[in-house]
Regions:
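Active-site-adjacent structural segments surrounding the nucleophilic cysteine of cysteine proteases
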Residues: 1-97
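Conserved active-site-adjacent core of cysteine acyl-enzyme catalytic domains
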Residues: 2-13, 72-208
Length: 208
């Protein structure tokens, strides 16, 4: 089966002041040490907001745009940290992520909705592989990037755990996802992750 991807991922490309081309935001762009350490949730939320604002004419008001580039994205990142503010344990579930995301939208005068899937390895509550596939396929086909919380890597050699990233594409049969994380992209085997991640995680999509 063909890869399912958001239609214009290049809208999430930013050139930093030193000339580095990044895909999606990077928490290192924050100014303070605490923000740099803990800001993955607000960055993932910023990716969702930015993409919606730049692909839907009626959602332009979700963020202020001067030149549509790095500086504008930084303004959004800083604002988002005030709505999705990490505590000592970070933003460790969708319940700490979604309310701030929607509150930000309301403050901008736009009513948005969120769909989310908590992934826990507990009997009777753990989503199956098909649940995750269906969730990702549904929202990527609707041209919505998906925020992904990885609480533990399982057998995958991912750069970080207890960490929010953004899913841009999925190959549904192999369950290989294309992920934006700290300005770079890589692939991750979501099927392997679901089967081996001890702490699970969450998926969140923002939509009208």
């Amino acid at each position: 089966m063909q890869q399912i991807t958001i239609k214009t991922p290049e809208l999430l490309e930013f050139t930093t002041p030193d000339g580095t081309l990044c895909t999606g935001g990077h928490q290192e762009w924050y100014d303070t040490k605490w923000h740099k350490m803990s800001g993955c949730g607000p960055v993932a939320a910023s990716n969702l907001i930015w993409y919606q604002a730049h692909t839907r004419e009626n959602l332009r008001g979700l963020c202020d745009t001067v030149n549509g580039g790095y500086d504008d994205y930084r303004v959004l990142m800083d604002a988002m940290f005030g709505y999705i503010t990490p505590g000592r344990g970070g933003i460790h579930n969708s319940g700490l992520f979604v309310p701030g995301l929607l509150a930000y939208c309301r403050e901008r005068g736009l009513k948005m909705e969120a769909d989310w899937l908590e992934i826990r390895h507990k009997p009777r509550r753990a989503p199956k592989l098909n649940d995750v596939r269906d969730f990702l396929t549904r929202w990527l086909e609707k041209d919505c990037a998906v925020a992904f919380l990885n609480r533990s890597n399982g057998k995958l050699k991912l750069p970080d755990s207890w960490h929010w990233v953004t899913i841009l594409a999925l190959e549904p049969i192999s369950m290989t996802a294309k992920i934006s994380d700290e300005g770079r992209t890589y692939e991750a085997d979501m099927g392997n992750w679901i089967n081996t991640s001890f702490l699970g995680g969450a998926l969140v999509a923002l939509h009208q």
